[in-house]
Amino acid sequence: MKVGIIGAMEQEVTLLRDRIENRQTFQRAGCEIYTGQINGVDVALLKSGIGKVSAALGTTLLLEHSKPDVVINTGSAGGLAPSLNVGDIVVSDEVRYHDADVTAFGYEPGQMAGCPAAFAADEKLIALAQEAIADLQLNAVRGLVVSGDAFINGAEPLARIRTTFPKAIAVEMEATAIAHVCHQFAVPFVVVRAISDVADKASHLSFDEFLSVAAQQSTRMVEAILAKLAAR
């Protein structure tokens, strides 16, 4: 099995990249893909860049170039669930766009025309993530992750998301675009991210301070999932 791993930013991929054995690098269109092995598992690690377009472009390149069997989206997220604190883990059961609106034509909020209302994560990958959470004894929440081309920093956008998507546990900028591409290619995916900030008016300050914590925690999770895959 080959596992595709996607992070948007340098800080979100650097720890995993350093753990890749027999590493080779592929660069195209502003994206970087690092291939090799972690814990004996073949991996292809993508640094996509920030936002939905960069994520979709990079994911397409990853799937075409490296042909992974599954995809894990890692990195940081803003917490929406009240039980989440910096460093805690979120695992997607589904993802939606929070900034797509074609409701005038009968679609649900966040649903893109011609697409499912939500993109469902793979149950087997979710189960592996939950096993890793138990092993590492981390606080985690499973649920809806929402994505859009905005860093949520303020009461008004936060209130809009909470009102429109009351079940959302976290918000970030790439996961749904990644899931959208995986859906088109019929490749199973899961989002496993760590909380860098609680989405509020000071979230930009928290993000700058705690991104490294989120990167460390999400890396621990990905490594634990890979170790479980290697043992099977």
Swiss-Prot record:
Residues engaged in binding substrate: G78, I152, M173, E174
Annotated keywords: Amino-acid biosynthesis, Hydrolase, Methionine biosynthesis
Record: active site: E12, D197
Pathway: Amino-acid biosynthesis; L-methionine biosynthesis via salvage pathway; S-methyl-5-thio-alpha-D-ribose 1-phosphate from S-methyl-5'-thioadenosine (hydrolase route): step 1/2
Any GO MF annotation of the entry: methylthioadenosine nucleosidase activity
Biological process, per Gene Ontology: L-methionine salvage from methylthioadenosine; L-methionine salvage from S-adenosylmethionine; purine deoxyribonucleoside catabolic process
This enzyme's EC code(s): 3.2.2.9
Catalysed reaction equations from the record: S-adenosyl-L-homocysteine + H2O = S-(5-deoxy-D-ribos-5-yl)-L-homocysteine + adenine; S-methyl-5'-thioadenosine + H2O = 5-(methylsulfanyl)-D-ribose + adenine; 5'-deoxyadenosine + H2O = 5-deoxy-D-ribose + adenine
GO cellular component: cytosol
Family as reported in the entry's similarity comment: Belongs to the PNP/UDP phosphorylase family. MtnN subfamily.
Subunit and partners: Homodimer.
Function field: Catalyzes the irreversible cleavage of the glycosidic bond in both 5'-methylthioadenosine (MTA) and S-adenosylhomocysteine (SAH/AdoHcy) to adenine and the corresponding thioribose, 5'-methylthioribose and S-ribosylhomocysteine, respectively. Also cleaves 5'-deoxyadenosine, a toxic by-product of radical S-adenosylmethionine (SAM) enzymes, into 5-deoxyribose and adenine. Thus, is required for in vivo function of the radical SAM enzymes biotin synthase and lipoic acid synthase, that are inhibited by 5'-deoxyadenosine accumulation.
NCBIfam families reported for this sequence: MTA_SAH-Nsdase, PRK05584.1
PANTHER family per the UniProt record, alphabetical: 5'-METHYLTHIOADENOSINE/S-ADENOSYLHOMOCYSTEINE NUCLEOSIDASE, 5'-METHYLTHIOADENOSINE_S-ADENOSYLHOMOCYSTEINE NUCLEOSIDASE
UniProt name for this protein: 5'-methylthioadenosine/S-adenosylhomocysteine nucleosidase
Organism: Pectobacterium carotovorum subsp. carotovorum (strain PC1)
